[in-house]
Amino acid sequence: MNIPNLITVLRVLLIPIFILLFYLPYNWSYMAASSVFAFAAATDWLDGYLARRLEQSTPFGAFLDPVADKLMVAVALVLLVQEHGNLWLTLPAAVIIGREIVVSALREWMAELGRTRPGGRCPTWANRKTAAQMLALVILLANPPAFTFWVLLGYAFLLIAGGLTLWSMLQYLRAAWPHLKTDGRKEIKLFESRG
């Protein structure tokens, strides 16, 4: 296993650590959990950079990197929804997690049809979405659930991330729609002929 893949595996292994820290009954536990999450988020940039720089990109790394990111974000969102328990956090969390489920299912279905990922990536929007998500999660994990300046700022960034996430999902579905309409009809006819 190469260095970038080891860093990605480390990111996955940090998830139970920030969960444990989050639930410790100490004043410093929120900040410790947030620090581990921030470190894990930084490794996301580092593993990609090293994979390109050292020419160590692998199919395993291409698979594991987004899985590690999605696991890390989903777990942090679940922790925060449970801890804060309000609409300002729950709604964007549902949008972010829901988008990952929809897009993952769409990618799998498109792959079964022999189609590649619809449309191109939009690095600028993807980077903004990721930055808003990570910033929101670092801020919210670091603070107990009270309406302080920092928590409200975290909510604001999470609402922005939720909006960008919804936008990216709609763009992805729009790009895939022509394939879904034509190939979907073929799939239905094939299914009906077998039935």
From Swiss-Prot:
Keyword tags: Cell membrane, Lipid biosynthesis, Lipid metabolism, Membrane, Phospholipid biosynthesis, Phospholipid metabolism, Transferase, Transmembrane, Transmembrane helix
Protein's cellular compartments: Cell membrane
Lineage: Bacteria, Pseudomonadati, Pseudomonadota, Gammaproteobacteria, Pseudomonadales
UniProt xrefs under InterPro entries: CDP-alcohol_PTase-I, CDP-OH_P_trans, CDP-OH_PTrfase_TM_dom, CDP_ALCOHOL_P_TRANSF_CS, Phosphatidylglycerol_P_synth
UniProt-listed Gene3D superfamilies: 1.20.120.1760
Chief location: membrane
Similarity comment text for this entry: Belongs to the CDP-alcohol phosphatidyltransferase class-I family.
Pathway given in the UniProt record: Phospholipid metabolism; phosphatidylglycerol biosynthesis; phosphatidylglycerol from CDP-diacylglycerol: step 1/2
Transmembrane segments: 7-24, 60-81, 134-150, 157-173
Source superkingdom: Bacteria
Catalytically driven reaction(s): a CDP-1,2-diacyl-sn-glycerol + sn-glycerol 3-phosphate = a 1,2-diacyl-sn-glycero-3-phospho-(1'-sn-glycero-3'-phosphate) + CMP + H(+)
Membrane disposition: Multi-pass membrane protein
Keyword Transmembrane helix among record annotations: yes
Any GO CC annotation of this UniProt entry: plasma membrane
Physiological role: This protein catalyzes the committed step to the synthesis of the acidic phospholipids.
E.C. number(s) listed in UniProt: 2.7.8.5
GO molecular function terms noted in the UniProt entry: CDP-diacylglycerol-glycerol-3-phosphate 3-phosphatidyltransferase activity
Any one Gene Ontology BP term: phosphatidylglycerol biosynthetic process
Listed name of the protein: CDP-diacylglycerol--glycerol-3-phosphate 3-phosphatidyltransferase
